[in-house]
Amino acid sequence: MGDHIIRSLSVSGGIRILVCDVALLTREICRLHGASPTVSIALGRGLAGGALMGALLKPGQRLALKFEANGPLRKMIVEADSDGAVRASVANPTAEAEPLEGRWNVAGVLGRAGFLTVSKDLGLGGQPYQGTVQLCSSEIGDDLAYYLADSEQTPSAVGLGAALDEDGLISVCGGFLVQALPGVDEAERDRVTDNIASLPPLSSLLREGGTQKLLELLFDSVAYTRLETRELFFRCGCGREKVERALLSLGGAELWDMGTREGEARVTCEFCRQSYQFDADELKALAETATLTRIHEEHEHLQQ
C-alpha cells in the first residue's frame, strides 16, 4: 500500500485515532529540496503531522502549519487539504544539528524558541482562521498536540516517526493522532493512554508492522471501527497563471522596471522548486495589465 491515512473511532464513540504512512511523498519532497538528513527527519514529522490534521478537515478545506524558531532551519511550512494532498517548504534545507543522545536533533535544527501558527481555510470565502502557540518541545509532535489542546480544546496525543536508509533517504515515515472526544469513557481513555506509553519506537513499528499494526496496538483491548482509508499524495498546485498573479501584485512600475533593466525574471516555487521564466516582453505585458487594472479600480472607486 502506498501513502495513506486510516481514520477510526472506538465503538463507544469516545476515542478517535488516525494513523498515516507518508514515506513516499516525504522522500520525494526531501529530494526536491535537497534536504539534509536532520531536515529530512523534520520534514517527515511535519508532513505526517500535516496529513493527520488535514484528515480532520471537511471537504473543500485546507490548512497550513508554520513552524518558526531560532534554529538554523528557521522556518518550515506544511500545507494539507481535505483531499489528502500535502506539500512543504523549508527556509534552509541544508541546515544541520549535532545528534542528541544518539537521536536526530530535530529540536536543535528547528530551534527551541519559536512559534507554531496553524491557518485554516474553511472554504467560506472569508479570512482563514488562525491560531498561534509557542513551541513546547520543537519535536513537532508534542507541539501539534499542545496546539490542539490549547487552541482547539481537544485533548490529543500525536506521535510522529521517520527514519533514513543507508543512503540518507527517507525509508519510513508516519504517525498517529489520538483524540479524546466529548463524553469519552474514562476507563477507555486510560487504556488508550497506557497503550500509547507502551508503544515500541514508532519508526521501527511502522517498518515492521505498518499502519494497521500501529492502529491495533493503540486500541488494543478497546473495540473500534475503521471509518476510512484514504490515499495521501504530494501535490503542489502552483502554475504559471498563479505566478503571473503574484507578479501583478508588484505593480506596473516595478514590472516595467524589471523588464527594461533586468530583461527577465525567474520565479521559483518554494514548495516544488519549479522555476518559471519571464522574458522582457512578458514582463512589460504584465506591467501594462497591472497598470490598466489599477486605473480601472481607481475609476470604479470614484464612481461609488
Curated annotation (Swiss-Prot):
GO cellular component: cytoplasm
SUPFAM superfamilies from the UniProt entry: Hsp33 domain, HSP33 redox switch-like
Location in the cell: Cytoplasm
Primary residence: cytoplasm
InterPro entries: Heat_shock_Hsp33, Heat_shock_Hsp33_C, Heat_shock_Hsp33_N
PTM field: Under oxidizing conditions two disulfide bonds are formed involving the reactive cysteines. Under reducing conditions zinc is bound to the reactive cysteines and the protein is inactive.
Keyword terms of this UniProt record: Chaperone, Cytoplasm, Disulfide bond, Redox-active center, Zinc
Keyword Cytoplasm: yes
The keyword Protein biosynthesis belongs to this UniProt entry's keyword annotation: no
Cysteine disulfide partners in this protein: C236-C238, C269-C272
UniProt-recorded Gene Ontology molecular function terms: protein folding chaperone; unfolded protein binding
GO process annotations (BP): protein refolding
PANTHER family: 33 KDA CHAPERONIN
Family of the protein in this entry: Belongs to the HSP33 family.
Function of the protein: Redox regulated molecular chaperone. Protects both thermally unfolding and oxidatively damaged proteins from irreversible aggregation. Plays an important role in the bacterial defense system toward oxidative stress.
HAMAP family (alphabetical): HslO (MF_00117)
Identification of the protein by name: 33 kDa chaperonin
Organism: Pelobacter propionicus (strain DSM 2379 / NBRC 103807 / OttBd1)
The encoding gene: hslO
